[in-house]
């Protein structure tokens, strides 16, 4: 696609306004609800994150940037880790410097020192694209550059993306950004080039504590499927109706 055609398409598309809904924490799913979301394909790739195991080391973020050619020192990333620190005054402090790439080695959050004695709870939350069953980003893309595979992975065709930004605005999880080099929409792809060859995603492979897992929800013998069906799992921002396929163990009500 030439630059002139891209500019023409960008300027000709008007009137789209992203819906604004109030933030909420999460929804706990029953096994029957999870099974209802798997679709018709023989494969349904899903992520499982265990907050109780995440230590905020940032290895996953580093691995993702390296694997997927996201500039290392630019403040955008396909996956990130947030730190939540709750204090005695019931304040929840949240930060993710450089997406948590370098881990969390200071008690400062946004330049403010947090008194260790005031902390009542602290934890880390891995985030990224939720590869929703009903992705809002796919619905709003005016040229079909954002699409969903039969096995549930949401991808972006760089050769078709016109950089209008509608998908970035539509994503309720903040999982999309403009690639600083290619000038197109960018996001997690579940390392599709790896999983289609039987390999793990870069972030899962890099996680030293098993906080990130990846599996096929259609395979009853998959360890990830077994965990999702037998443990208390939740999803983020259920109120948007996108049916996220990223599941969490140990979600706190403060996570949004």
Q: What role is predicted for each listed range?
A:
Residues 16-17, 23, 211:
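Residue-level detector of secondary-structure transition/capping positions
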Residues 2, 23-63, 239-241, 247-248, ...:
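C-terminal segment of N-terminal export signals and the immediately downstream linker at the start
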Residues 202-256:
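Long, compositionally biased charged/polar accessory segments in the mid-to-C-terminal portions
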Residues 43, 123, 150:
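Exposed loop/turn and edge beta-strand positions of beta-sandwich/beta-sheet ligand-binding modules
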Residues 108-110, 123-130, 138, 247-256:
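Short flanking/linker segments adjacent to small metal-binding domains or redox-active Cys/His motifs
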Residues 47-63, 67, 121-144, 155-174, ...:
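Cysteine-centered iron-sulfur cluster-binding motifs in ferredoxin-type domains/subunits
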Residues 1-19:
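N-terminal secretory signal peptides and thylakoid transit peptides that target proteins
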């Amino acid at each position: 696609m030439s630059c002139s055609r891209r500019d023409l398409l960008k300027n000709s598309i008007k009137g789209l306004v992203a819906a604004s809904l109030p933030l909420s924490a999460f929804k706990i799913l029953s096994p029957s609800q999870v099974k209802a979301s798997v679709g018709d394909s023989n494969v349904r790739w899903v992520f499982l994150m265990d907050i109780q195991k995440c230590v905020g080391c940032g290895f996953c973020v580093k691995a993702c940037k390296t694997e997927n050619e996201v500039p290392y020192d630019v403040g955008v990333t396909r996956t990130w880790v947030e730190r939540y620190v709750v204090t005695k005054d019931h304040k929840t402090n949240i930060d993710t410097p450089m997406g948590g790439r370098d881990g969390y080695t200071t008690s400062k959050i946004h330049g403010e020192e947090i008194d260790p004695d005031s902390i009542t709870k602290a934890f880390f939350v891995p985030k990224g694209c939720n590869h929703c069953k009903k992705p809002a980003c796919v619905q709003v893309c005016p040229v079909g550059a954002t699409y969903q595979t039969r096995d549930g992975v949401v991808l972006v065709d760089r050769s078709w993306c016109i950089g209008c930004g509608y998908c970035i605005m539509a994503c309720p999880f903040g999982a999309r950004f403009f690639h600083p080099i290619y000038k197109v929409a960018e996001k997690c792809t579940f390392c599709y080039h790896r999983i289609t060859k039987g390999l793990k995603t870069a972030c899962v492979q890099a996680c030293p504590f098993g906080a990130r897992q990846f599996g096929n929800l259609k395979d009853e013998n998959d360890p990830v499927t077994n965990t999702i069906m037998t443990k208390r799992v939740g999803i983020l921002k259920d109120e948007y109706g996108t049916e996220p396929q990223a599941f969490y163990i140990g979600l706190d009500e403060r996570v949004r």
